[in-house]
């Protein structure tokens, strides 16, 4: 069975987080990984360069030197290790898994809130508090989506759960009940 990036990412992320905690470098590593993610988002071809046989070893070494130049030893070692084991393309998944573990350690939950109109600052703060309490976390990182088709109410998506209190959802449930045998 082939091991996918999604399978190895949590292992690398957990090991990196533990090493960062041991060296009191969690914040530094987190910031560097966010910067790396931006580089990969802006230049996605970087992720495939190390697998490309047409690119010389010297060019690959030069790229690795550039990527690790300002990196902490932990992040530099992660880059070199993933390249060495042919997992460089897994870095976005590893960064995502690290971010999840980091948020979990910090007591932060990521949630997407969909409403028909933009939330006021007070409404957003109230939702953050409610979501954090509901999931037993300290705070909520809120991503707000405005979708007029929900008509009213709020849909919250967090940790694979959906809490749908929208008017559209209620209408859909009523319609299904009316059409049921």
Swiss-Prot record:
SS bonds (residue pairs): none
Localization per record: Cell membrane
Topological type in the membrane: Peripheral membrane protein
Keyword terms, alphabetized: ATP synthesis, Cell membrane, CF(1), Hydrogen ion transport, Ion transport, Membrane, Transport
Cited InterPro entries: ATP_synth_OSCP/delta_N_sf, ATPase_OSCP/dsu
GO CC annotation: plasma membrane; proton-transporting ATP synthase complex
Keyword Ion transport belongs to the record: yes
Single GO molecular function: proton-transporting ATP synthase activity, rotational mechanism
Main location per the UniProt record: membrane
Subunit structure: F-type ATPases have 2 components, F(1) - the catalytic core - and F(0) - the membrane proton channel. F(1) has five subunits: alpha(3), beta(3), gamma(1), delta(1), epsilon(1). F(0) has three main subunits: a(1), b(2) and c(10-14). The alpha and beta chains form an alternating ring which encloses part of the gamma chain. F(1) is attached to F(0) by a central stalk formed by the gamma and epsilon chains, while a peripheral stalk is formed by the delta and b chains.
Record's function text: F(1)F(0) ATP synthase produces ATP from ADP in the presence of a proton or sodium gradient. F-type ATPases consist of two structural domains, F(1) containing the extramembraneous catalytic core and F(0) containing the membrane proton channel, linked together by a central stalk and a peripheral stalk. During catalysis, ATP synthesis in the catalytic domain of F(1) is coupled via a rotary mechanism of the central stalk subunits to proton translocation.
Alphabetized PANTHER family for the sequence: ATP SYNTHASE DELTA CHAIN (PTHR11910)
Family designation: Belongs to the ATPase delta chain family.
Name the UniProt record assigns to this protein: ATP synthase subunit delta
Organism of origin: Lacticaseibacillus casei (strain BL23) (Lactobacillus casei)
């Amino acid at each position: 069975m082939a091991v996918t990036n999604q399978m190895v990412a949590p292992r690398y992320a957990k090991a990196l987080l533990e090493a960062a905690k041991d060296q009191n470098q969690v914040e530094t590593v987190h910031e560097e990984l966010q910067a790396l993610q931006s580089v990969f988002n802006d230049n996605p071809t970087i992720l495939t360069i190390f697998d490309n046989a047409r690119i010389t070893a010297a060019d690959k070494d030069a790229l690795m030197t550039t990527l690790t130049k300002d990196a902490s030893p932990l992040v530099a070692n992660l880059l070199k290790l993933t390249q060495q084991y042919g997992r460089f393309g897994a870095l976005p998944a590893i960064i995502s898994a690290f971010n999840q573990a980091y948020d979990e350690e910090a007591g932060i939950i990521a949630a997407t809130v969909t409403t028909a109109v933009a939330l006021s600052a007070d409404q957003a703060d109230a939702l953050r508090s409610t979501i954090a309490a509901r999931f037993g976390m300290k705070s909520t990182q809120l991503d707000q989506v405005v979708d007029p088709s929900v008509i009213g109410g709020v849909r919250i998506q967090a940790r694979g759960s959906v809490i749908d209190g929208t008017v559209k959802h209620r209408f859909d449930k009523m319609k299904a009940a009316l059409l049921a045998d």
